């Protein structure tokens, strides 16, 4: 589908899936912290889950549901347009977002496991190597590309001539 309302709802539904996944990560973290000296997760697993929770909440839920999903649904309506200026780019942006989620989840199953670098990926922690980190960084890059396309489409819709957008 290339209708902005459907794509906005797809963004929001997928972002809420990411929210539920981050909630599972949060439950794992809370289970580990429930009692002192708990051996539910190893230190490395705890850091991996913490990284996945933070990055999923920030990159895959808050930004996508709050800005992109809501924006796709509302921006053309606020401008009086039938659709966004580039509807196929809008659809591609959603599928790139979904692909980024799949890449991020796949990172857990590669040698070295999921990244345990924290959601900020700052230097002392981000010096970790392994295929999992590479896949997670590829997911973040794909997500950034998706966001760039989606937001450029919003700008193009806003700047479109009146007869082109309506």
Where are these regions (language model features)?
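...captures the hydrophobic TM-helix bundle architecture rather than a specific catalytic motif
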Residues: 1-166
